[in-house]
Structures are given as C-alpha cells and as structure tokens.
From Swiss-Prot:
It comes from Alkalilimnicola ehrlichii (strain ATCC BAA-1101 / DSM 17681 / MLHE-1). SUPFAM superfamilies: HydB/Nqo4-like. NDH-1 shuttles electrons from NADH, via FMN and iron-sulfur (Fe-S) centers, to quinones in the respiratory chain. The immediate electron acceptor for the enzyme in this species is believed to be ubiquinone. Couples the redox reaction to proton translocation (for every two electrons transferred, four hydrogen ions are translocated across the cytoplasmic membrane), and thus conserves the redox energy in a proton gradient. Keywords: Cell inner membrane, Cell membrane, Membrane, NAD, Quinone, Translocase, Transport, Ubiquinone. PANTHER family: NADH DEHYDROGENASE [UBIQUINONE] IRON-SULFUR PROTEIN 2, MITOCHONDRIAL (PTHR11993:SF10), NADH-UBIQUINONE OXIDOREDUCTASE 49 KDA SUBUNIT (PTHR11993). Belongs to the complex I 49 kDa subunit family. It holds the Pfam family Complex1_49kDa. The keyword Cytoplasm does not apply. GO terms for molecular function: NAD binding; NADH:ubiquinone reductase (non-electrogenic) activity; quinone binding. Its EC number is 7.1.1.-. This is NADH-quinone oxidoreductase subunit D.
Length: 417
C-alpha cells in the first residue's frame, strides 16, 4: 500500500462551522494542520461599486448588509464620512441615540458570536440563552425603524426619527396562555427608553448565566486555552483591531483613543487580554458586553432628561418633515430634490472609522464634487483577521480550526463586500 505524508481537506463552504461561505483548503498531516488557505469571494456583491453609482443618501441600506450582524455600526462609519465631507455635525440628541444603538448593536453581535462559537465547539445551551436576549434587542431595532435587522436608521445629519413612545407587543396566540402573554408584555407597557432601561437592569444577570455555563467549564477551557495564540507585536503587524487586538494585550479602542460622537462623554473601561489565545478573546468580548450595557444606561439617562431635535434643520441635506411638506411648497421641492438627485459634496477625501463589534470598520471616501462619491473604500476588520488564519491554525488539530474561526468572529458580508 502506498504511503502518503500529507493530504488536503476542503473545509466549507457548506460546513456548518464555516460561518457562511468560507472555503478553506487545509493541508493535513494526520490530524494536524500544516497549512490553511482561506478562499474568499463567494459572497461578493460589489457594494463599493454600487455606492459609487448612487447619490450619497441612497447607499445607507447597502451598509447594513455588509457585516449583517452589526448593522448600525456599518451605517455609522458611512454616515460619518458623508458628514465630514459636508462639514456638518448631528444634533447632540442624535449623537446620543447613535451611541446607544451602536452599543445595542455590539451586544447583538457578541450574543450572536457567543452562541455560534459555543455551538461550533459543542455547547448548545449558550446558543439558546443568547438568542433569548437578542430577541429583545431586535425589538428595539424594529420599534425605531420597522426592520429587525437592516434598519437604515442613521442619516447624514442625525437619525431618521426620534425614539418611539411605545414598544411592539406580543399578540394573543393559541400557543400562549393569558398569563404568559402578560408576563412577556410586562416590560413593553411604557416608552422605548423604559424598555431599554429594564433590559439593562436584567442583562448583567444574563451575562453571569453565560459565564456560569462556559467560563470555568472544563471542556470549554480545554478547547480554547492556548489555541490560536497571537503575540501583541504580531497582532499589530497583521493589522488586527477590536477584540482580536485587545485579546492579545494591546489597549486600543477607537471609542477612547479617537472618540467620535459622544463617546468622550460616557464612562467605560477597555477590557484587555494577557495571553492572546481564544480564551482571552472570549473573556474580552464577555466584558465588552458588560461595558456596552454600562454605556447604554448612561445614554438612556441622558436621553430621558434632554429632549431636542434629532436631525439637522438644513433642508439642503436633511429632508423636511411630512407635516411641513403638506403646507409648504419649498419643503416639497427640497424633499423632491433630495430624493431624486441628492446633494453634492465639496471635492476632497475623508476617512471615517468606528469601533465596530469586530474591530475598526472604516469608510474612505473620495468626492469629485458630484452628487455621488467618486470612490468608496470600506475597511473590514474581518479581512485582516481571516488573513491570519494560516498562521493561527498551523500546528493545531483539525478540531481547533473550528475554534479559531469562531474566535475571529467572521462574517463574510464585510469581507467579500
């Protein structure tokens, strides 16, 4: 019988642990990975090119569909880039709403990551627990924009509308008793801020539940400790950002180091790892959820006591209200022009970056003075992380590759763009 030393394995794109459409060619020697070669491009939708063929204000919806687990953070970078070009700033209330929803999005993303990561490694209960809390936050998206995922809520100059005075309620159903229904709708009787405040009171207890399931779990630790180790120097060289960089021990967070909107007005800490392995990155993200909860609390408190406009009054950029349009011909003209040809920006180039849940999500935009961008370049954090897959997986077992993909928090919408 002919002996062979190494063989190749196709991992994905149909593999359940491949997180979407990842195809990886693994060169194996027995159970050990000798080389990992990720193949990208299976979800390429030409988002950058599409954004270059439409007026500025008509591409916001595309941003939601990049990293489709942290929707509003993508919008934030795009909207900030346009605001920089125009030289405008959103009203302070709109900035607080944006920061609050960025942090709600961060929790949404990390819950999805934790559930999927647990499921990949074999811990199914965490997945079910995480989706219980995600449901409440999805309802916040729905209340404010009408959509559970692709909100298209941010606008250059503010947000689409102020926070609603009520929350969506569960309808009577033959599958639920009256008592169950009352319990499910108990927190939904007041305003949206009441609902979010109730969530922030409950959420730390939920995070404790996840930690009870996983943090000291013997199997969980055996699967994550000393797997996918990246040193601080190497993490910088590879272009890591977000929890991947902080997990390696580098305290870099755009919300603190280059604050945007009102991040310089809220208090929070930056969790940092020590070993740079999968387990450290898990601990960093768990602590990030607690810090996000803390920021949301501060935003809710400020928004309660400070009413005000959530959109610029300049109708050359921001559309007038429906009420104004019914009476005022000039407002109708503004509305028509905004939604047909949009607005022009001065020639120039800008880069706006936000601390998205996965890392630094940036939008580099070049304007030639027209009503649509000459060039839009999107900087996806997952791209740099996936590029390091070969280095992180080499020498590990095949089963550890799944843990490494999970710890990188890969979503292909932003990588393939």
């Amino acid at each position: 019988m002919r002996e062979f030393k190494s063989y190749t394995v196709n991992f994905g794109p149909q593999h359940p642990a491949a997180h979407g459409v990842l195809r990886m060619v693994l060169e194996m020697e027995g159970e050990t990975v000798r080389r990992a070669d990720p193949h990208i491009g299976l979800l390429h939708r030409a988002t950058e090119k599409l954004a270059e063929s439409k007026p500025y204000n008509q591409s916001i919806g595309y941003m939601d569909r990049l990293d489709y687990v942290s929707m509003l953070c993508n919008e934030h970078a795009y909207v900030m880039a346009i605001e920089k070009l125009l030289g405008i700033e959103a009203p302070i209330r709109a900035q607080y709403i944006r920061v609050m929803f960025d942090e709600i999005t961060r929790i949404l993303n990390h819950l999805m990551w934790l559930g999927a990561h647990g499921l990949d490694v074999g811990a199914m209960t965490a997945f079910l627990y995480c989706f219980r809390e995600r449901e409440d936050l999805m309802d916040c998206y729905e209340a404010v924009s009408g959509a559970r995922m692709h909100a298209a809520y941010y606008r250059p100059g503010g947000v689409y509308r102020d926070l609603p005075e009520s929350m969506p309620k569960y309808e009577p159903s033959k599958f639920r008793s009256k008592k169950e229904l009352e319990l499910m709708n108990a927190a939904r009787q007041g305003t949206m801020l009441d609902f979010i405040e109730d969530f922030t009171e409950r959420f730390p207890g939920c995070v404790d539940e996840y930690e009870t399931l996983l943090t000291e779990n013997r199997i969980w630790r055996q699967r994550l400790v000393d797997v996918g180790v990246v040193s601080p120097e190497r993490a910088l060289q590879l272009g890591f950002s977000g929890p991947m960089l902080r997990g390696s021990g580098i305290e870099w967070d755009l919300r603190k180091k280059q604050p945007y909107d009102v991040y310089d007005r809220v208090e929070f800490d930056i969790p940092v790892g020590t070993n740079g392995d999968c387990y450290d990155r898990y601990l960093v993200r768990i602590e990030e959820m607690r810090q996000s909860n803390r920021i949301i609390k501060q935003c809710v408190d400020w928004l309660r006591h400070n009413p005000g406009p959530v959109m610029l009054e300049d109708h050359k950029v921001a559309p007038p209200s429906r009420e104004e349009m019914k009476d005022d011909m000039e407002s109708l003209i503004h509305h028509f022009k905004l939604f047909t040809e949009g607005y022009t920006t001065p020639p120039g180039e800008v880069y706006a970056a936000v601390e998205a849940p996965k890392g630094e999500f940036g939008c580099y935009m070049i304007s030639d003075g027209a009503n649509k961008p000459y060039r839009v370049k999107l900087r996806a954090p997952g791209f740099a992380h996936l590029s390091a897959m070969d280095e992180m997986a080499r020498g590990h077992m095949l089963a550890d590759v799944v843990a490494i993909i999970g710890t990188q928090d890969i979503v292909f919408g932003e990588i393939d763009r």
